Amino acid sequence: MNKEASNNNNSAPDPYYILRGHKFNVNSVLFDKVNPNLLYSGSGDGELKLWNIEEKKCISTQIAHSEGIGGGVLSLQWLSNDNNNENNNNNDEICGNILSQGRDGVIKIWSIIDNCTFKNTYRLETNSLSLGKCSSLSSNLLSISGSAIDPTSSTSQVEIWDLKNKQVINKLKPNNQQLFEKLGLPMSLKLYYENENNDNSNQSNDQIRLCTGYENGELLIWDLRNTSIPLVSSKLHNEPILSFALSNNSTKGISGSGDTNIIEFNINYESKQFNITKTHKLNNGGISEIKIRNDEKIYATAGWDKRIRIFNFKKQTPLAILKYHTESVYSIDFNSNNILASGSKDCKIALWDIYTTKK
C-alpha cells in the first residue's frame, strides 16, 4: 500500500474559525483583493455570501443563481472595478466587483457597495453547461467551455467572450481533427497575459494566452493570435485535469486531476512541452482546486478526500495535511495576509492560519 509522504502531519494545525451559514455545499470561496478581511462564498443552492473574517460574521447574502439540478454557483472570480463604474447610476461607493458563474451558464457581475452590499450590474447568458470553471481577465474578457445545451456542439471548444459587448470574439479548437476528438471537454481554464509582470493596462488582446486542462488529462497553452495550433501541450494525467495553477511569471505550475497524482511542471516553449519536475503520489485521488500563495512560497490543494494539502512550492516538498472537513473540499483561497479559506461539501468554510510570519 502506498503511504503518502508528508512532513509534520502530527502537528498540522486545526482551523482557527469555522464560518457557518450555507445550507448547501460551498462550491467557491474568494478573498477580496483589496480588503483581506472580506471573503465571498457561493453555494450549490445559488446563494452568494459576503463575510467579514475579522468580525467572524456574514454581512450580506444574495440569491445569485437558480438552485436545483443544473443550478447553483459554480465559481467566483475577482474583477477590477474600472469598467463597471459606468453602470453606477446612483454614485454608490463601489469597493470592488466579483463575477459569479452559475451552473446554468449564466454569468453575473456584482458590485460591492460600501463593503457590505451586493448590487447586480451585469448579466450574460452563455451556452455553457459544463462543470468547468470559467476564467476572467481584468473586467473585459472571459473564457468558458463552449460545450453545452446543443449536444451536437463541439465538446473541445473554448469560447472567449468580450464581457463589455457580450459577444464571442474567439473560439479555440485545434484544426487537427484527431487531436480535437481525443481532448474531450475543457475542464479547467486560465486566461493570462504573455508577460504578467507588465502593467495590464498596457497589454493588448494579442498578448493573451489561455491554458486549458482537458478531459483526457492533457494540458494545453494557446496563443489567441493563432488558435489552430497549441503553443505547448503534454498529457500529464490519466484522468480529467480538474485544476491547475501557474506561477506569476507563467513559467511553472501545478496540476491535479481525478487520479492520485499532483504534478509540478516547468513550461518549455522551445520543446512545446510541459516538463514534469515532481510527482506527488496521494493515497486518495481527486483534486478540486489548487492555489499558490501570493509570495509563491507554498501552495495548497483541495481534495475529494476531505483533506487540504500544503506544499513548499520552491523545494517541491509536502509540508502538512489539514484535516477538518467531513466531506470533499471544493474550493480554497489565500488572502494577502496569507490566511487560507476552504469551502466544502459539508456546507462549512474553515479559516486557517498556517506558515504565516507573525509580527
UniProtKB/Swiss-Prot annotation:
The keyword Cell membrane does not apply. WD repeats lie at residues 21-61, 68-120, 132-171, 192-232, 236-275, 282-321, 324-359. Keywords: Repeat, WD repeat. InterPro entries: G-protein_beta_WD-40_rep, WD40/YVTN_repeat-like_dom_sf, WD40_repeat_CS, WD40_repeat_dom_sf, WD40_rpt. It holds the Pfam family WD40. It comes from the Eukaryota. The keyword Repeat applies. PANTHER family: GUANINE NUCLEOTIDE-BINDING PROTEIN SUBUNIT BETA-LIKE PROTEIN 1, TRANSDUCIN BETA-LIKE 3. This is Guanine nucleotide-binding protein subunit beta-like protein 1 homolog. It comes from Dictyostelium discoideum (Social amoeba). The gene is gnb1l.
